[in-house]
């Protein structure tokens, strides 16, 4: 069984209580981001592209506990950044376990083996190790040669010491089905409890914006991968979510189901999109126009999203309905999903596509210098600054200059009522009215510049040809 019975019971009773209370919008899993620092520089990641002063900041254990208590979820996922780089991560985990929360610590496992002694095996703690496929594919995906072997060694050691271990795999466009299926079997051999997987999502702030599939391609890809399953494979996910990935079931996005909390606050509207932040969970629920998000909304940013952060909670919610219970039981009893056409398609992949392909793509423009110096340009300029992956300098009408990262903006029909929020280098969160901005300059470096998939592959192939080993795209160096 991929999930302990006690955990299933806890989640089931929690969901049923929400339904009995008539709550339509309730959280299921808190995505708790205690820091954005990382020891990898994955081109497809949109969570680490921040200036150095932001990467240095982290949540305290007390702030983490308040967020968990505030939303009341039974399960907490700790992504990052790399959580094991947090100097008090063991204290955070102990506090959550003491609250009897089921904790999934997401990690690339580069530090896991050397830090296992900080933790105690418990049914409440699971290490969710990021593994992006077999060795070559994983190393290229995380932009670090040798990363797979380090992670696999840590997985085996954690299993040996009695920890719960799952894997978390992101599947990108062009992924070879045979390779993924072989990877699943390899993870079962390593002794993991279960596997989680999701299609890639093109984060606005990720260096790589090209290697992501549309919804139809995702469904076709997951149909090939998940049909005709090996009986040994165990997935740490709702079976209805897996059917959704395969195109066998339609689900509506519930972005409030997996809210994200970080140094900026409660992220609007979900873990993936960054349309601003709320100071409290209730403010997140009340101030977000949820009709603007999800596949049915027509929002282009949501058109191809099929990620667990939007749809896993939807699948769990549907499970606790009359039809959902029978659908879940059927999916669990008949989990092989025999599909002759899918089998033929997998067999036809007798020549695996080259993993290293460099596309001729136009680079994302880098913004420098003064962008806004006239009131008529203010709204457009601030929107660019909000999307920018670096520091800006805001000059006020008084002549005062604020240098830092714009992490939120509330644009109203009346610009006089519109505001932005900037986290300055000293760490202050300052609210500024649009009307008070005299000039806006992009003075900081674009933190994703030169870190695209193409830049990484070019570096990898050149250095590989020169005979180098342990090639990597190094993370941002902090002072």
Language model features by range: what are they?
Residues 1, 59, 99-102, 123, ...:
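Radical SAM enzyme [4Fe-4S]-AdoMet core and its adjacent flexible, acidic
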Residues 2-118, 122-123, 328:
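Conserved alpha-helical substructure of the radical SAM core
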Residues 24-25, 248-253, 384-386:
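Short loop/turn motifs at secondary-structure junctions and domain boundaries
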Residues 26, 267-348:
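Flexible mid-to-C-terminal extensions adjoining Fe-S/redox cofactors in radical SAM and related proteins
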Residues 28-33, 237-241, 284-295, 390-392:
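Short, intrinsically disordered, charge-biased short linear motifs at domain edges
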Residues 38, 42-45, 253, 265, ...:
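Short cysteine clusters
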Residues 52, 274-277, 409:
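A short acidic/small-residue loop/turn micro-motif
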Residues 347-479:
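Conserved RNA-binding domains used in RNP assembly and mRNA/RNA metabolism
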């Amino acid at each position: 069984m991929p999930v302990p019975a006690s955990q299933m019971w806890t989640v089931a009773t929690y969901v049923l209580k929400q339904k009995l209370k008539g709550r339509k919008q309730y959280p299921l899993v808190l995505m708790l981001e205690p820091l954005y620092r990382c020891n990898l520089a994955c081109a497809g990641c949109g969570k680490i592209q921040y200036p150095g002063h932001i990467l240095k900041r982290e949540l305290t254990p007390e702030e983490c506990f308040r967020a968990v208590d505030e939303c009341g979820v039974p399960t907490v996922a700790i992504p990052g950044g790399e959580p094991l780089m947090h100097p008090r991560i063991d204290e955070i985990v102990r506090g959550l376990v003491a609250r009897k929360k089921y904790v999934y610590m997401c990690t690339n496992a580069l530090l896991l083996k050397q830090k296992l002694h900080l933790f105690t095996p418990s049914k409440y703690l699971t290490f969710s190790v990021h593994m992006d496929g077999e060795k070559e594919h994983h190393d290229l995906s995380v932009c670090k040669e040798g990363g797979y072997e380090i992670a696999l060694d840590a997985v085996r050691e954690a299993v040996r010491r009695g920890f719960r271990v799952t894997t978390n795999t992101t599947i990108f466009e062009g992924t070879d089905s045979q390779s993924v299926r072989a990877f699943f079997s390899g993870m079962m051999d390593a002794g993991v409890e279960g596997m989680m997987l999701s299609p890639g999502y093109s984060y606005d702030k990720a260096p790589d914006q090209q290697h992501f599939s549309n919804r139809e391609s995702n469904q076709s890809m997951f149909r090939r991968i998940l049909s005709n399953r090996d009986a040994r494979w165990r997935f740490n996910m709702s079976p209805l979510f897996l059917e959704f990935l395969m195109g066998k079931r339609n689900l509506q996005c519930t972005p409030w189901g997996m809210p994200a909390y970080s140094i900026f606050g409660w992220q609007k509207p979900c873990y993936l999109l960054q349309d601003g932040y709320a100071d409290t969970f209730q403010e997140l629920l009340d101030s977000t126009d949820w009709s603007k998000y999800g596949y049915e909304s027509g929002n282009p940013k949501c058109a191809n999203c099929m990620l667990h952060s939007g749809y896993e909670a939807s699948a769990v919610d549907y499970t606790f309905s009359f039809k959902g219970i029978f659908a879940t039981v059927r999916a669990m009893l008949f989990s092989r999903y025999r599909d002759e056409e899918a089998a033929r398609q997998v067999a036809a992949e007798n020549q695996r596509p080259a993993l290293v392909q460099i596309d001729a793509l136009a680079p994302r423009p880098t913004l420098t210098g003064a962008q806004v110096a006239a009131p008529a340009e203010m709204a457009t300029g601030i929107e660019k600054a909000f999307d920018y992956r670096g520091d800006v300098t805001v000059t006020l009408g008084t002549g005062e200059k604020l240098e830092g990262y714009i992490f939120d903006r509330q644009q109203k029909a009346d610009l006089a009522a519109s505001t932005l929020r900037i986290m300055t280098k000293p760490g202050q969160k300052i609210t500024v009215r649009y009307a008070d901005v005299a000039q806006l300059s992009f003075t900081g470096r674009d933190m994703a510049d030169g870190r695209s998939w193409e830049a990484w592959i070019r570096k990898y192939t050149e250095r590989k040809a020169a005979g180098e080993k342990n090639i990597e795209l190094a993370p941002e160096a902090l002072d």
